[in-house]
Amino acid sequence: MIKDNQMFIIDAHSHLWLKQDTTWNNLKIKTSEGNSSRSFFLDQEVQMLPPFMIDGKNSAEVFLSNMDYAQVSAAVVTQEFIDGIQNDYLMEVQRRWPDRFLVCGMCDYFRPGFIRQAESLIRNGFRAIKIPAHRLQLSDKRIMMTSPEMMQMFHLMEDCGIIFSVDLANGDTNVAEMKEIIQECPRLKIAIGHFGMPTTERWQEQIRLARNEHVYIESGGITWLFNSEFYPFPGAIRAIREAIDICGIDKLMWGSDYPRTITAITYRMSYDFVVKSAELTDEEKGKFLGENARHFYGFNNLKKLPYIKNMSE
């Protein structure tokens, strides 16, 4: 429970889509027929959504209901190749609820000429652009984030004040590329997702990137990375404490990775383990759960949401 006037909660990493029907690395991702809460994912059927979302629609309306109940004031909606490019739907979402959502656009980085897509996204009002860098490694090739066209896009984003949202591959795989991007575009605001992949070796190298002025870390996916522990995720708390020691609490933001993570836990549980932790101070919790994201993403007109008692209480 978040008491009145205590803190704003902002989710820095979530996903929305109306239907999955795409391919990545020549493998299919598609909403299942029948029970559409499941999807055929790469080589198996998985529970992609909570089992009661049987229409397969991961809509903003359902997410807002979860956000309101969990007292989450706003959310950043990012993108992933496995969901298909969702630019049209996400812009509709941002236009309908501008005070609740900041959405990320995404280009088809596998096809030359994507800089034109980036220019169009910026013209259409996207304030952030996403690269799922861990998906740029394919069976037969790897797309480098330091290619001439990528660097052209980053310079454009820097000049236009567009945020670069990125999920990196395990450990330090992409760190050298990121260092080059940061050096080349020092004013580019960067949010690194999945908390640096803290269950992999050399994950701290991703966190060290946040020692640069405009680089932040968000924790989207941290509960699935520590899923084997389950709630209250003591390993995740230890990772947060270690990250604080590396780059400071002011550079860290909470993210849920909704909706995939709530196939295992409730939406509130995806941050409640932080609220209840004795290993973090109240000031650290406030910054991590919302204050830092409010500053970084520029959320204005946020409102505090009331606590709604549930029928189990």
Describe the residue ranges of each PLM region.
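Active-site gating/metal-coordination segments in enzymes
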Residues: 73-74, 81-172, 216-224, 229-230
